[in-house]
UniProtKB/Swiss-Prot annotation:
Similarity section: Belongs to the complex I subunit 3 family.
UniProt source species: Bacillus cytotoxicus (strain DSM 22905 / CIP 110041 / 391-98 / NVH 391-98)
Pfam families, per database record: Oxidored_q4
Domain of life: Bacteria
Molecular-function GO terms, alphabetical: NADH dehydrogenase (ubiquinone) activity; NADH:ubiquinone reductase (non-electrogenic) activity; quinone binding
One GO location term (cellular component): NADH dehydrogenase complex
Topology term for the membrane: Multi-pass membrane protein
Catalytic activity: a quinone + NADH + 5 H(+)(in) = a quinol + NAD(+) + 4 H(+)(out)
Record key words, sorted: Cell membrane, Membrane, NAD, Quinone, Translocase, Transmembrane, Transmembrane helix, Transport
Name of the molecule in the record: NADH-quinone oxidoreductase subunit A
E.C. number: 7.1.1.-
Oligomeric and partner information: NDH-1 is composed of 14 different subunits. Subunits NuoA, H, J, K, L, M, N constitute the membrane sector of the complex.
């Protein structure tokens, strides 16, 4: 039985090694084989063939980051809910209660953010 586990870890190790090695080799070969001829035109910002007329660095309001953070939180919630939903019949009532508590905590946080008017634009 130990041989099966060692073989599984070896396969994971090979995939990890290839996952790191292949992009590094491809990027290195691309850098070595491409022609290097820098020019002023190549270093300008390209906006659909039009010369840029102002600085591309624009400051975003902090509320955008709050919405992005909320999106990430609820996206991670989906990562937790999907495996639970797939294996629901094997996990039983205890896992159902745990997931309900998890979702309830997220909904309480969302209600708190809504009450504090974090989700309003103006």
């Amino acid at each position: 039985m130990e041989n099966v586990y060692e073989n599984s870890y070896m396969i994971v190790g090979i995939f990890l090694l290839l996952g790191i090695l292949l992009p590094v080799v491809a990027l290195t070969l691309g850098k070595l084989l491409r022609p290097h001829k820098p020019s002023e035109a190549k270093n300008t910002t390209y906006e659909s063939g039009i010369e840029p007329y102002h600085d591309a660095n624009v400051r975003f309001h902090a509320r955008y980051y709050i919405f992005a953070l909320l999106f990430v939180i609820f996206d991670v919630e989906t990562l937790f809910l999907y495996p639970w939903a797939v294996a629901y019949d094997k996990l039983g009532l205890f896992a159902l209660i745990e997931m309900l508590i998890f979702v309830a905590m997220l909904l309480i946080g969302l209600a708190y953010a809504w009450k504090k008017k974090v989700l309003q634009w103006l």
